[in-house]
């Protein structure tokens, strides 16, 4: 089972396409949609929804996959549920990058402060990160610098921020899920 978490653009048709591509790894791909506008509510909702979905699966190794803002949540929700996660062009600091896009971006800082201290150290090797070398939205090298001590980093030389084509990375994602 793969949980797919969309980015800030929840209605993008690319989300359906990415889910279809992920079905080459596991036919059971589940979209977990969230508001993107209310971080504290989103966190509570995502925790409850993932727990509920896991009760209805016999997969011994479910995987979280998120793109952009969805990768922010995939890392945290995956950690809190003991799941591996794949972070694609993660928005690591939405308290900064979401300024002007949502009403209370400071809620992300509050969530980060309440998260388990040093959670990435406790989550080492339980996530992999795929970064677009030419991400037009986020500074990928800063993400690599922040995450490389904890997670494997895979670079992509062609995909934009929304990462419409996962095909080149599907074998590595599958190996990570099963490994």
Swiss-Prot record:
Pfam families: UPF0227
SS bonds (residue pairs): none
A single MF term (Gene Ontology): hydrolase activity, acting on ester bonds
GO cellular component terms, A-Z: cytosol
Family: Belongs to the UPF0227 family.
PANTHER family named among the record's database cross-references: ESTERASE YQIA-RELATED (PTHR35602), UPF0227 PROTEIN YCFP (PTHR35602:SF2)
Protein name: UPF0227 protein SO_2251
Species: Shewanella oneidensis (strain ATCC 700550 / JCM 31522 / CIP 106686 / LMG 19005 / NCIMB 14063 / MR-1)
